[in-house]
C-alpha cells in the first residue's frame, strides 16, 4: 500500500501544488501532445529535463515517481523489445540467424521507452499534487461547455473521483485476500504460467464480490442523503484561475513550439 501511487495525494505547498487543477490538467494534455511530437534525442532530453525540473519544484521525493514506473515495467519492456526486434529499417547493427536489430528499430525503441517514462512521470506528478476531488472538479469544469451537447460533465467528474478513491481500497482488499489465501496454503509464485493464472482466480472472485458490495453500499448511502447530480449542486471549494495558471499554460505552449521547431521530420537523430 505504501508503494501505491495512483489515486494518492501528497500534501504540500509547492508552486505545483498551488496551481489550479484545471491548468495542470490542460498542461498535461498539451504535454502529452508534445511528447508525441518529439521524435529525436534532443527534444526528448529537453522534455526529460523539463519534467525533472517540475518534479524538483513539487518538493516530492523522487522515490514516488520511480514507484509510479514500477507497475508499468513489464509493458514498457515488452513494447520496447518488440520495437527492437520487429521494426526493420536503416543499417543492421546485429544479426543472429533470423534475429536482426536495425538502427531504426533501436531508435524507435528508445523513443517508445522515453515516451512511456515521460508520460508516467508527468501523470504521477499531476495525481501527487492534486487531490482526487480537485481533479474531478477540473474535469467537470473543462467539460462544462459540452453540457449543451448532452455530455454529462458532472457525472463524468463524479465517476473519476470515485474511481481514484476506490483504487487504494481495492488494493487493500487485494492484499487482505492474498494474505488470507496464503494462510490457507496457496502459493502464488510456484508452478508454470497456467498454474499461476489459476492461482489468481481465488483472488478475483472475492475481490469482485467485495467491489460490488462496496458500490452497492455507496449507491444506497448517496440516495439516503438525497444526492442529485447536475447544475443544482454547489461546490464547497470554488476553483480560482489566477495569473500563475495562465503563465504555466503559456510556458508549456512555448516549450511545445520550441521543441516542434527542433524535431526531426521523420526519424531519431
From Swiss-Prot:
One Pfam family here: CbiQ
Alphabetic keyword roster: Cell membrane, Membrane, Transmembrane, Transmembrane helix, Transport
Cellular component per GO, a single term: plasma membrane
Transmembrane segments: 28-48, 49-69, 73-93, 109-129, 246-266
Single annotated GO MF: transmembrane transporter activity
Function: Transmembrane (T) component of an energy-coupling factor (ECF) ABC-transporter complex. Unlike classic ABC transporters this ECF transporter provides the energy necessary to transport a number of different substrates.
PANTHER family associated with the record: PROTEIN ABCI12, CHLOROPLASTIC
Family classification: Belongs to the energy-coupling factor EcfT family.
UniProt name for this protein: Energy-coupling factor transporter transmembrane protein EcfT
